[in-house]
């Protein structure tokens, strides 16, 4: 996967907003895996992947339905940003440790209480 920038995280969170809450963690991991696969495809064949783009998280995310960007104090949007960060972190840890078959732990998701 190409280097992850702020815009990649925002695009990923926007895509996750269109996914039902119970399926978001899996969707976040799939999004990161698709970006990685697209980058390997690009390097091997010298062209972008037809469905997942150029290997950036943003390209993979914007190829899916996505919601408009929300404010950072929106609890649902904040949870989606956290999930994208957790998915990237999980992907990096698996690459560094070489643990390919490990099952990912559920990320810690903060539930916001409105006052």
Regions found by a protein language model. Give the residues of each.
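Short terminal alpha-helical segments
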Residues: 1-36
């Amino acid at each position: 996967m190409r280097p992850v920038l702020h815009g990649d995280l925002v695009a990923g969170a926007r895509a996750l907003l269109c996914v039902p809450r119970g399926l978001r963690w899996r969707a976040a991991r799939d999004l990161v895996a698709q970006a990685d696969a697209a980058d390997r495809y690009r390097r091997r064949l010298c062209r972008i992947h037809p469905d997942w783009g150029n290997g950036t998280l943003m390209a993979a995310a914007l190829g899916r339905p996505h919601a408009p960007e929300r404010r950072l104090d929106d609890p649902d949007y904040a949870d989606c940003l956290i999930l994208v960060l957790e998915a990237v972190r999980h992907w990096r840890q698996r690459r560094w440790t070489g643990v390919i078959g490990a099952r990912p732990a559920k990320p810690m998701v903060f539930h916001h209480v409105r006052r």
